[in-house]
Each structure stands twice: as structure tokens, then as C-alpha cells.
């Protein structure tokens, strides 16, 4: 197994008596895409800021590349895209990229060459001489992403990278992140968009109210939460199946969409028994399939109770953004 690039060891951070991150431990192996997932205010940005040494933990330890200490000491090996985007609005796109690369120690000629290559790659080549404030929000976001990559970092940290992107640019970002992994980079990104996380993540950690709910390989998490879900399609009305759905010894939960239904089985229920009952009821089936739960469903099942408890709490993380 790859050695961890990032380790949080029982890290806690408090603001004004509120615990934003509560004893969080996680490890990000080298060469993977790791998702830090949670609802708004869960502690994702606070955790990333502790990794980057923007703020210090009140308790616990941050280790990067096997060394104790946070991102300031390893800044040359890290590319960081913060949630709050910030570029010099009156500078021209190419000039601002070259300037930011030079700040990271990249020689001017190399910075210009890399910036032009990245601009062409992300469809912004024709905009290189335009001022930043002439670009759309999505374009500016891509420019800021480029600025995180020009010094060729080993670890790329992206805080809500898909926020505000249209579907086309979100796909461009997804393809770029996948290519970074193929090149051996380690990517840590935070998001509350489960569809993107499911497509990208090798490993993930779900947090809520600053606490870890689950972490590990995506495949293992799905396996742990799977095996008790059915998708049933009907040729015609599902009315005949309603009595079967109501049997609490077989079915724990039903999402009935009319022409098909998603079932969560009771703990000791047998899918074959449900199939037999449905056939006996006269229901005409077009589909009967055991399925893995989506990451979105796992997220809702895990985070839902925590989110309900957090609803009345102030968003302290946002207040310290």
C-alpha cells in the first residue's frame, strides 16, 4: 500500500467555543484521488486550512510527506486551489499566471511556456491577453486552477473545485484531475457534490459536524453498505406489489416511482423470497436487480441524522472563511 502523503491525527479545531473539527483522523495515500466529503459547514475547509498551515489545530497533528508540520514548509510540493477564488482582476491572464508561477520559484521562461500549454489545454488560449475581469466566473476558475499547477506539485489540494462550473467545464476539470492521477500526482479535493466524487474518488472520508463518519476505499464503503438494495421495474402498474412492499419483515424502506421502485431490504430478508412474493402477487416485472447503493444514498444515510442535528447550529466554518 502507498505510504500516506497527508495524515491528520486526531485533529481538533475550535472557534469561539464551537468545535469545527472534532478529533479527525485520516490518511491520504500517494497517487490517489481522495475525496473529503460533507455537507456545508461540516469542517472540510477548516481541515484543508490546517493541512495548508493557514490555521493551526488546537489539538492533534498534521503530517505531510512523512514529516510533522503543515503546508507552509512544503509549499513547493503543493498546489492549492482555495474555495475563495482570488486573482488580480486588472492583470492580463498570461501575466498573472507567469507572476504566480514565479512566486513559486518557476523561472520566467518556463512559467510562460507552461502557462501557454495549460491555457491551450483548458480552452483558454485565445484569452491569454485579456484582463482577468473580462473572463466569466468559470473561466477565472480555470485560470486559478492553472495557477496551482504551474510549479508541477506532487500534491494537489482542491477545495470545492466544481462549484460554479457548468457541465462542460466540470467535465474538463474531471478529465484533468484524472490525468493528474495517471501522472502519479496525489489529489485531495473537498466537495458536497456526490456525483462527481463517485466518478473520481479512489478513497474518501465523509465528515459531518467536524466528525468522521466513514473513510476508506470507495469500493469497500459501497460493499459495506451494499447487498441489501433492489431495483425493481414493472411492466405496467406496480399496484399488485404494494402488499409485498408493506411486509416489514422483508422490506425496510421503499422509494416507489410508479414504473419502478428502489427497495432497502430488512436485515435478514432474502431477495429471492421477495421475487417469489412479487410473482405470486401477479406483478409483471421488467427488472429485478440487486444493486450497490450510490455514493449519494450512502451520504444521505450517514449524514442525514447529523445534518438534522446541525440545522439549528450556526455555520461557524463559513463565518471564519
What are these regions (language model features)?
Residues 102-105, 250, 304-308:
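Non-catalytic alpha-helical coupling and interface elements of nucleotide-dependent molecular machines
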Residues 68-69, 212, 235, 268-269, ...:
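Short, surface-exposed acidic/glycine-rich loop or hinge patches that mediate macromolecular interfaces
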Residues 3-6, 13-209, 213-214:
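ABC transporter nucleotide-binding domains
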Residues 266-321:
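C-terminal coupling/interaction segments
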Residues 174-266:
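ABC transporter nucleotide-binding domain
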Amino acid at each position: 500500500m502507498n505510504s500516506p502523503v497527508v495524515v491528520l491525527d486526531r485533529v481538533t479545531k475550535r472557534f469561539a467555543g464551537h468545535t469545527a473539527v472534532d478529533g479527525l483522523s485520516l490518511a491520504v495515500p500517494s497517487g490517489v484521488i481522495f475525496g473529503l466529503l460533507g455537507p456545508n459547514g461540516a469542517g472540510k475547509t477548516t481541515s484543508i486550512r490546517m493541512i495548508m498551515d493557514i490555521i493551526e489545530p488546537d489539538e492533534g497533528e498534521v503530517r505531510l510527506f512523512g514529516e510533522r508540520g503543515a503546508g507552509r514548509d512544503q509549499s513547493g510540493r503543493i498546489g492549492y486551489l482555495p474555495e475563495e477564488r482570488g486573482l488580480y482582476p486588472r492583470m492580463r491572464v498570461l501575466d498573472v499566471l507567469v507572476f504566480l508561477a514565479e512566486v513559486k520559484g518557476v523561472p520566467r521562461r518556463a512559467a510562460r511556456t507552461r502557462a501557454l500549454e495549460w491555457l491551450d489545454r483548458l480552452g483558454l488560449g485565445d484569452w491569454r491577453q485579456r484582463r482577468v475581469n473580462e473572463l466569466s466566473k468559470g473561466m477565472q476558475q480555470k485560470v486559478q486552477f492553472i495557477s496551482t499547477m504551474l510549479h508541477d506539485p506532487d500534491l494537489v489540494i482542491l477545495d470545492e473545485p466544481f462549484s460554479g462550473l457548468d457541465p462542460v467545464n466540470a467535465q474538463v476539470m474531471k478529465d484533468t484531475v484524472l490525468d493528474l492521477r495517471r501522472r502519479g500526482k496525489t489529489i485531495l479535493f473537498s466537495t458536497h457534490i456526490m456525483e462527481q466524487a463517485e466518478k473520481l474518488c479512489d478513497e474518501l472520508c465523509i465528515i459531518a459536524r467536524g466528525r468522521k463518519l466513514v473513510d476508506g476505499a470507495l469500493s469497500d464503503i459501497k460493499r459495506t453498505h451494499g447487498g441489501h438494495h433492489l431495483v425493481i421495474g414493472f411492466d405496467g402498474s406496480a399496484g399488485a406489489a404494494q402488499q409485498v412492499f408493506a411486509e416489514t419483515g422483508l422490506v425496510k424502506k421503499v422509494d416507489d416511482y410508479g414504473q419502478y421502485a428502489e427497495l432497502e431490504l430488512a436485515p435478514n430478508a432474502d431477495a429471492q423470497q421477495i421475487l417469489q412474493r412479487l410473482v405470486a402477487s401477479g406483478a409483471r416485472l421488467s427488472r429485478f436487480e440487486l444493486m450497490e447503493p450510490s455514493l449519494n444514498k450512502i451520504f444521505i444515510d450517514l449524514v442525514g441524522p447529523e445534518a438534522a442535528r446541525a440545522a439549528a447550529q450556526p455555520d461557524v466554518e463559513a463565518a471564519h472563511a
